[in-house]
Amino acid sequence: MVVVSVPAEVTVILLDIEGTTTPIAFVKDILFPYIKENVKEYLQTHWEEEECQQDVSLLRKQAEEDAHLDGAVPIPVASGGDVQQMIQAVVDNVSWQMSHDRKTTALKQLQGHMWKAAFTAGRMKAEVFADVVPAVRRWREAGMKVYIYSSGSVEAQKLLFGHSTEGDILELIDGHFDTKIGHKVESDSYRKIADSIGCSTNNILFLTDVTVEASAAEEADVHVAVVVRPGNAGLTDDEKTYYNLISSFSELYLPSTQSKV
């Protein structure tokens, strides 16, 4: 087994989600397809609710901004007309946005509400790799703080870790960051995270599967290890040589405690 020693000054472990704590396949093959497969039923069930109407209004506004794009799907203004026709327009718009991998606030808001309903109803559980929870428990016992940094919203992060295949594991997480603090490929984001936590950047070890993020973190003087999981993007030979690589959280070692973390 490969063992990566955690530098003695590290007191915070910062975790990516997709491809690090959670299989990419769960996000790609379960989480996002769930939206496409269930959006019509969700809208029909919740159409009269204020939250749903706010989501639709935001999507309509986005559709107006997208009107100049090829293939964009308009959403008609609410009237006394056919509700099913309105719902179908929203379904078609969502499908179009997702097929183009759009990350609009309007789309993310509806997706977040749909996932919340699915998780709380027990229709879905978030997968985490088997090595994650035991390792995080050991890190915390060793005095480490553990934070999440993901492009998914903090609300979505809490849904995932609150309804995981390992149960509700939110108690193991000290805090959450999303792109409101900055994008993961920008080094300044990691400085802001350190400021928010109240530590130096070199007190942080960031675990991610994306080398562009690892590089940005390193520029901010954050320690990094690149996580190699099934389904993750391949690494170049140079990246394999340059970065500390782990395929399991159990491969991290805390010299200060003389125990594998």
UniProtKB/Swiss-Prot annotation:
Single biological process term from Gene Ontology: L-methionine salvage from methylthioadenosine
Cofactor(s) in the UniProt record: Mg(2+)
Pathway involvement of the protein, from the record: Amino-acid biosynthesis; L-methionine biosynthesis via salvage pathway; L-methionine from S-methyl-5-thio-alpha-D-ribose 1-phosphate: step 3/6; Amino-acid biosynthesis; L-methionine biosynthesis via salvage pathway; L-methionine from S-methyl-5-thio-alpha-D-ribose 1-phosphate: step 4/6
Spans traversing the lipid bilayer: none
Family named by the database record: Belongs to the HAD-like hydrolase superfamily. MasA/MtnC family.
Keyword Translocase: no
Catalytic activity: 5-methylsulfanyl-2,3-dioxopentyl phosphate + H2O = 1,2-dihydroxy-5-(methylsulfanyl)pent-1-en-3-one + phosphate
GO molecular function, one term: acireductone synthase activity
The EC number(s) this enzyme carries: 3.1.3.77
Entry function: Bifunctional enzyme that catalyzes the enolization of 2,3-diketo-5-methylthiopentyl-1-phosphate (DK-MTP-1-P) into the intermediate 2-hydroxy-3-keto-5-methylthiopentenyl-1-phosphate (HK-MTPenyl-1-P), which is then dephosphorylated to form the acireductone 1,2-dihydroxy-3-keto-5-methylthiopentene (DHK-MTPene).
Name of the featured protein: Enolase-phosphatase E1
Residues engaged in binding Mg(2+): D16, E18, D209
Subunit text: Monomer.
Pfam family, one: Hydrolase
Cofactor note (record): Binds 1 Mg(2+) ion per subunit.
Gene transcribed to yield this protein: Enoph1
Source species of the chain: Rattus norvegicus (Rat)
Localization annotation: Cytoplasm; Nucleus
Binding sites annotated in the UniProt record for substrate: S150, S151, K184
